[in-house]
C-alpha cells in the first residue's frame, strides 16, 4: 500500500478490478438469494394490435412453474412517468416485442419452457415500421432529446446558400443501432414481510429506479431500496428504468419469494431502447477560401407510439463551425416500433457523422486540406448561444493529431495509394460533446483510525467511478487513495444522478469534493482526538449546478484513421486510428484512455459492422442477437491510440474535468468514412460501409 498521496490524474488501477476478473463481484442476476425463483418474459409476436386471450393451463401444468402473470392477473400499478413501464396493465400491443406476460419457475429453463407453452391469440391492426424521408406522418416536435429546440434559424440561410460560390448538398442515412452491453438488463427483487421492496438492478441510476418503483407500487421512496453495485455496461440503455425491474417486483410480490429476471439477449432490441434511424440532409455554402457562409442540417427520424423521443442529431451543427446563416431542424414520425432511447452520444454520434462527412466533401470540392478547412472555420464563440467557450482546443487537437498521425505526408488524391488489391486511404473528423453536471449529494466520514469513507449513490457501469471518486476525495483530504473507502450503487446512500451524458464524474465528483472540503474544515476545528463514532459531514451541490454559466462548455477532439479497402471483397479494415481530445483535466489517465478507446471502437462498429433492420412485414428487428448484429471484436480494433491535450478550464467544476465517456465515439465513423473515400474515390453515404455496399460502388 502506498502511503503518499497520488496526484489527481495518476493511472490508478480500478479498485474493483480483481473482484471482477475472479468472479467475486456480483451482478444483478448473480445473487442466488435463498428461495429465489426465475422469471422469463413473454414478448408479443405481432407488430400492432391487442391480446384477445392467453391460455396458461399448459404452462402452469409444467413441473416447477409457479405462476404466469398477464394483464388479467398482474398487480395494478400507479401511473408511471415513463409509459414503457406500464407493463401487464392492459391488452394493448403497441409494437412487436412488447411484453405481454411473465412466467415464474424454480429454474430459468423451467420458466422458459413455461413461456413457450403459452397459447396467445391476438387481434391485429395495420402497422408501419419503416422510416422514409417523405413519410406522410412527419411532424416537427417542440423539442429534441435534451430539451433542445427542434428548429433553429439564424440569418438568411436560403439567400446565403444560393449566393455561395461553392456548395455541398448531400444526404446521409444511418439505420437503427443497438446498445448491447455485455450484461443484459437484469433485476432480482424481493419483498420483506413488512412490505419493503429491495431490487438489485442493472441500472445506470439507482435513485431514479427507486423513485419509479415507489410510484408504481404505491410506496414511499424509503420503502424501496435499489442496489446497483456492479453494472456490466449500459451505453445509455440502462439510463432510465426498464420493464424487467417492474416485472421482477410484480412476480416477487405475487409469489412471496425473491425473483430474478435477466432479459434474454434476443428480447433486448424491443425493450431497452435503440438509437433511432436518421436521414440527414446537410448543406454547406462556402467562399472559395473555405470560409463557411451557410450551414443547414435537417434531420428526419422516428419515434414510437408509446412515447416521443427525438434524436437531436442536428444540434452539434449549432456549435461546431461559425456561420451567420444557418438552419437546423428535426422532423419525426411515430411508427409502430419500440421506443428509441439514449445510445452513447445520442445526437452527437449520428449528427457529427453527417456533418463531418459533409465538411470532408466540401474540402474535396474546394481542393483544400480537410484539417485546414476545419481550422479556418474554428469560431471564438459558440455560434448558437454567442457565449464565449470556457475552453475550445479543437485546433490544438487537430494539429497535435495531424503531427502524431503523419498527416503532412498524405497524398491528397483519392485512390492514389495501393498495395496490390488493397486501396489505402486516410481520413479526419472533428468531435464535440457538451459538458453537463447535475445536483448530487455526498457524505464524507473521518474515522478515529485515520481512514475515510465517502458515500454517494453513484453508479459504476464499467468506467472506474469508484476509483476516480476515491482519487478526488484523497486529493482534498491529502491522504493516500487506499485510505479512502467509497460506497456507491445503493439508493439508501445520498441521492445522486445517473451515469449518463458524460456527466457522472462531474456531478458526483463535485459533491464528493465539496463534502471532503467540508470535512477538512470540520477536522481543522477539532484540536483533540476524534470521537469514537468519528466525524461525518454531508454536501449538496444543487445550488452550484443550477447556476447558469456565462460560458459555453464543451469537450472537443479530432479523429484520424487509415483504412485498407480490399478491391476484391469490398472488406474495409482500419489499420490505425488515432484520437486526440480536449476534455478538461483528466482525473485518471488509465481509465480515461480506456473510455476514449472504447468510444472509438464503438465508432468503428458504427462505421463498418453494426446494422439493424426493421422487418416491414413482421415489425421486428431482424438483427436481434450478437450472431446477426455485429459489434467489433478485438481483431477489428487493433492500432487504436488515444491522446489528450492538457486543458486548464476554471469554469467547469472544482476538478476542472469534462466528461469523457462519449466523445470517443463522436466523429469516429466520419473519419473512417472519409478515409474510405480517400482510398477509393467513392463517397458512400449510408452506414455501415459493408462489403456488399463497397463492391456495388466499385463495380
Please name every model-derived segment.
Residues 106-107, 257-301, 513-529:
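Phosphate/diphosphate-binding loops
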Residues 15-19, 116-123, 127, 204, ...:
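Extended active-site and interfacial segments that coordinate phosphate-rich ligands
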Residues 90, 183-188, 279, 438-443, ...:
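Short glycine-rich loop/turn motifs
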Residues 71-72, 218-225, 253-259, 288, ...:
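C-terminal catalytic domains of large/alpha subunits in multi-subunit enzymes
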Residues 10, 16-22, 146-187, 193, ...:
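Glycine-rich loop/linker segments at domain edges
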Residues 1-145, 167-170:
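Flexible, low-hydrophobicity surface segments
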Residues 78-82, 114-117, 201, 210-212, ...:
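Short acidic, glycine/serine/threonine-rich loops at helix termini
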Residues 230, 234-256, 260-262, 465-466, ...:
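Thiamine diphosphate
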Amino acid at each position: 500500500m502506498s502511503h503518499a498521496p497520488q496526484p489527481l490524474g495518476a493511472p490508478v488501477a480500478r479498485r474493483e478490478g480483481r473482484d471482477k476478473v475472479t468472479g467475486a463481484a456480483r451482478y444483478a442476476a448473480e445473487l442466488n438469494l435463498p428461495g429465489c425463483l426465475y422469471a422469463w418474459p413473454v414478448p408479443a409476436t405481432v407488430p400492432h394490435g391487442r391480446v384477445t386471450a392467453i391460455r396458461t393451463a399448459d404452462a402452469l401444468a409444467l413441473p416447477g412453474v409457479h405462476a404466469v402473470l398477464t394483464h388479467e392477473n398482474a398487480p395494478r400499478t400507479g401511473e408511471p412517468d415513463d409509459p414503457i413501464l406500464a407493463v401487464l396493465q392492459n391488452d394493448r400491443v403497441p409494437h412487436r416485442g412488447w411484453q405481454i406476460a411473465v412466467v415464474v419457475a424454480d429454474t430459468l429453463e423451467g420458466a422458459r419452457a413455461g413461456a413457450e407453452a403459452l397459447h396467445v391469440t391476438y387481434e391485429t391492426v395495420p402497422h408501419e415500421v419503416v422510416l422514409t424521408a417523405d413519410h406522410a406522418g412527419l411532424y416537427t416536435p417542440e423539442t429534441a432529446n435534451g430539451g433542445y429546440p427542434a428548429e433553429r434559424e439564424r440569418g438568411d440561410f436560403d439567400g446565403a446558400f444560393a449566393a455561395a460560390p461553392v456548395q455541398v448538398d448531400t444526404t446521409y442515412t444511418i439505420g437503427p443501432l443497438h446498445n448491447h452491453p455485455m450484461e443484459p438488463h437484469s433485476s432480482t427483487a424481493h419483498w420483506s414481510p413488512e412490505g419493503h421492496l429491495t431490487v438489485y438492478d442493472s441500472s445506470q441510476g439507482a435513485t431514479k429506479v427507486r423513485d419509479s418503483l415507489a410510484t408504481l407500487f404505491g410506496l414511499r421512496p424509503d420503502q424501496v431500496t435499489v442496489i446497483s453495485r456492479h453494472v456490466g455496461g449500459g451505453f445509455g440503455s440502462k439510463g432510465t428504468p426498464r420493464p424487467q425491474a417492474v416485472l421482477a417486483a410484480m412476480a416477487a410480490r405475487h409469489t412471496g419469494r425473491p425473483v430474478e429476471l435477466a432479459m434474454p439477449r434476443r428480447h433486448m432490441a424491443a425493450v431497452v431502447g435503440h438509437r433511432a434511424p436518421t436521414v440527414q440532409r446537410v448543406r454547406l455554402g462556402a467562399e472559395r477560401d473555405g470560409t463557411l457562409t451557410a450551414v443547414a442540417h435537417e434531420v428526419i427520424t422516428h419515434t414510437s407510439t408509446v412515447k416521443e423521443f427525438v434524436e437531436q442529431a442536428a444540434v452539434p451543427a449549432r456549435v461546431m463551425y461559425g456561420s451567420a446563416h444557418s438552419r437546423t431542424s428535426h422532423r419525426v414520425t411515430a411508427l409502430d416500433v419500440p421506443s428509441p432511447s439514449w445510445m452513447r452520444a445520442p445526437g452527437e454520434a449520428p449528427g457529427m457523422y453527417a456533418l463531418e462527412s459533409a465538411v470532408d466533401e466540401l474540402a474535396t470540392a474546394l481542393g483544400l486540406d480537410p484539417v485546414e478547412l476545419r481550422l479556418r472555420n474554428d469560431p471564438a464563440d459558440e455560434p448558437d448561444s454567442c457565449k464565449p467557450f470556457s475552453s475550445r482546443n479543437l485546433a490544438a487537437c487537430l494539429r497535435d493529431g495531424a503531427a502524431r498521425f503523419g498527416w503532412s505526408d498524405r497524398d491528397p488524391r483519392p485512390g492514389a495509394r495501393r498495395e496490390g488489391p488493397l486501396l489505402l486511404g486516410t481520413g479526419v473528423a472533428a468531435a464535440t460533446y457538451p459538458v453537463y453536471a447535475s445536483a448530487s449529494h455526498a457524505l464524507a466520514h473521518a474515522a478515529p483510525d485515520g481512514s475515510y469513507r465517502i458515500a454517494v449513490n453513484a453508479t459504476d457501469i464499467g468506467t472506474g467511478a469508484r476509483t476516480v471518486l476515491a482519487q478526488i476525495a484523497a486529493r482534498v483530504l491529502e491522504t493516500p487513495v487506499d485510505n479512502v473507502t467509497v460506497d456507491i450503487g445503493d439508493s439508501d446512500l445520498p441521492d445522486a444522478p445517473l451515469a449518463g451524458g458524460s456527466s457522472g464524474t462531474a456531478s458526483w465528483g463535485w459533491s464528493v469534493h465539496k463534502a471532503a472540503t467540508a470535512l477538512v474544515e470540520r477536522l481543522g476545528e477539532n484540536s483533540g482526538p476524534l470521537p469514537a463514532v468519528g466525524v461525518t459531514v454531508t454536501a449538496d451541490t444543487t445550488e452550484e449546478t443550477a447556476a447558469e454559466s456565462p460560458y459555453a462548455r464543451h469537450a472537443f477532439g479530432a479523429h484520424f484513421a487509415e483504412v485498407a479497402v480490399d478491391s476484391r471483397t469490398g472488406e474495409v479494415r482500419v489499420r490505425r486510428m488515432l484520437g486526440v481530445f480536449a476534455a478538461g483535466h483528466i482525473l485518471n489517465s488509465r481509465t480515461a484512455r480506456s473510455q476514449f478507446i472504447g468510444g472509438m471502437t464503438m465508432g468503428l462498429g458504427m462505421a463498418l459492422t453494426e446494422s439493424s433492420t426493421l422487418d416491414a412485414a413482421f415489425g421486428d428487428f431482424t438483427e436481434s442477437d450478437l450472431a446477426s448484429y455485429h459489434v467489433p471484436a478485438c481483431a477489428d480494433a487493433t492500432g487504436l491510440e488515444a491522446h489528450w491535450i492538457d486543458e486548464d478550464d476554471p469554469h467547469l467544476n472544482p476538478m476542472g474535468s469534462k466528461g469523457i465517456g462519449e466523445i470517443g465515439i463522436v466523429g469516429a465513423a466520419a473519419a473512417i468514412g472519409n478515409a474510405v473515400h480517400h482510398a477509393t474515390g467513392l463517397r458512400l453515404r449510408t452506414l455501415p460501409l459493408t462489403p456488399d455496399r463497397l463492391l456495388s460502388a466499385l463495380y
